[in-house]
Amino acid sequence: MSARSTFIGGSLAAVLVLAVAGPAAAHDDHHHHGHDRTAVQQVNLVADLPGVAATTDPELVNPWGLSRGPNTPVWVSDNGTDVTTVYRTDVAGSPVTKALSVAIPGGAPTGQVFHDATDAGNFVVTENGKSGPASFIFDSESGSITAWNPQVDIASAVTVAQGDNAVYKGLALWKTPLGSFLLAADFHNGRIDVFDSEFRRLAMPPTFFNDPKLPAGYAPFNVAVIGDAVYVSYAKQDAEKHDEVDGPGLGFVDVYTDFGQHRERFASRGPLNAPWAITVAPASFGKFAGDILVGDFGDGRINAFDNRGHFEGPLRGSDGKPLAIDGLWGLLPGTAANGGTDNLWFAAGINHEADGLLGLIGPAKS
């Protein structure tokens, strides 16, 4: 399916800015808690290699994005096997069970989001005479946007849009007073692509989601929505502008409000090393509770920042050493139904992305 592009003219752009402008950015709403540092522990649940985790699944290769609904299992983008796999567990320590595997047309999925199917008029998937609102939406390094509805095709997502020479590394669902939009991080072209609720790519003014102060050679690596704010992580491009260059200090994070026009630098260099995952620390994480957590793919560390971007330190194990997960990609808060509210799900492309690991990070057991 060829990309459809709609230009937002000056008057509509102005309306968008006014409609979403408001109080301070959402990251100001996350209050820092001054408790003692909480040590964390990593629990491996699923891996493609036998003996690494309690459950073995050969389809779990280089898992990137994670998503889930309030009561759904966790969905995982398996970049190395061109599928998304779905896993269910509880908080009582029972083994993980695999609920489903869904093919991703175009392959190499990266980011993904959950879409509430009760929002019936938006993000509608149609194929072979069947239609329904997407439950999960994916992007990929092939430049494809795909969406899944179980009544349309339970075994495969459907291609709904295609970016122009795009290499999408991350995806976010952004709900605004003017409707819902998809934000896709195009690492190759160095931009955030915006899609409306009919999967039409919008030709945004160049000032939207743009940081002119970035050094040359950096591009959006991932995008996340927290409250009303949009966080964009940036990594250094390789010569082909397809993959990131890892290294200490190679990374930035910006936070955007006012429909992408107002930008603040949230974090620069320092502990950042190809930052990808962005999420909020659970209340169980001691002094880091409510902080913004940024996961580095480059060194596998998870760094905590307060609501103004002040570096608080890395998550550490009970031995006092920074937790480092080889090939770290996604981080996702657990729920009471799946994983537990005290924990974070993590996904990692271990062994230089040749294999995969899924598990939980939570407070260390004393």
Role assignments for model-derived ranges:
Residues M1-A26:
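Secretory targeting and sorting signals
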Residues A24-S366:
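Sequence/structural signature of beta-propeller domains
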